[in-house]
Amino acid sequence: MKMVRAILRPEWTEEVTDGLAEAGYYSLTKINVFGRGKQKGITVGDVHYDELAKTMIMMAVEDEAVDKVIKIISGKAYTGNMGDGKIFVNTIEAAYTISSGEKGL
């Protein structure tokens, strides 16, 4: 199992989650976050914003689904500009359903 975390522009969140749902990936968590990447914030006129509003999507997926999920997220969130976001993938050692105690996704 893998944990896929994507940091996205908030305006693309619905497009990404709809694309994932259309492909059968319904289970996810969305969190509104603030952060900055390589661009170190943004300057608009005389005002510099150190951190920008983003959305983080977290999904636990089977190993064989990772490439497809990344392709969907990347395709739906892409503008070609700095600030499009970042995707992180980590290994999950185990997952348990709290209500049943069942192990796995």
Swiss-Prot record:
Annotated Pfam families: P-II
SMART domains hit by this protein: P-II (SM00938)
Entry keyword Transcription: yes
GO terms classed as biological process: nitrogen fixation; regulation of nitrogen utilization
InterPro entries: N-reg_PII (IPR002187), N-reg_PII-like_a/b (IPR011322), N-reg_PII/ATP_PRibTrfase_C (IPR015867), N-reg_PII_CS (IPR017918)
Top-level lineage group: Archaea
GO molecular function: ATP binding; enzyme regulator activity
Key words of the record: Nitrogen fixation, Transcription, Transcription regulation
Gene Ontology cellular component list: cytosol
Disulfide bonds: none
Keyword Hydrolase: no
Described function: Could be involved in the regulation of nitrogen fixation.
Protein family: Belongs to the P(II) protein family.
Name of the featured protein: Nitrogen fixation nifHD2 region GlnB-like protein 1
Species, as recorded: Methanosarcina barkeri
Lineage of origin: Archaea, Methanobacteriati, Methanobacteriota, Stenosarchaea group, Methanomicrobia
